C-alpha cells in the first residue's frame, strides 16, 4: 500500500498524516455510507414522511373503494423504515430497542388494518417478528464486532 504525505518536505504536524492513494472498493464505500449517522437519521426521516403520506391518503380515502392499499403500503413501509433507523443507531441493537420496534410494528399494523388495537395482526405476528429477531441479533453482534475493530 503506497501512501503520500499530505505536505512533502514541510516540518509541520500535518506532514505525519498520510493519505492512502488506493481507491476504496465498492464494499468499503457502501459500508462507510451505511454506517454514517446521516444515513441512519435519513432512514428515520423517510419513515416519518411515509407515515405522513399515509395520513394524507387517509383523508382522501373515503372517495376510493380499495383505498386501503393507498393507506397501508406507505404506512407499513414508513414504520419498517423508522424501526430500521432505530435499530441501526449506534451500530448495534439492544434487546430494549428490538422490543420497542416490535411494539411499534405490531401496534401500527393493528391501527392500520381496522383502527383498533386488538392483536388482529396478519403481517407482524409474534412468530414472524421472533424469526426476524434472530437475524437482527446476529447482525447486531456482527456490527458491534466491526465497531470494536475500528
UniProtKB/Swiss-Prot annotation:
Membrane-crossing residue ranges in chain numbering: 41-61, 67-87
Recorded topology in the membrane: Multi-pass membrane protein
GO cellular component: outer membrane
Keywords: Membrane, Transmembrane, Transmembrane helix
Primary localization: membrane
Domain of life: Bacteria
Localization: Membrane
Name this protein carries in UniProt: Sulfur-rich protein, serovar D
Organism: Chlamydia trachomatis serovar D (strain ATCC VR-885 / DSM 19411 / UW-3/Cx)
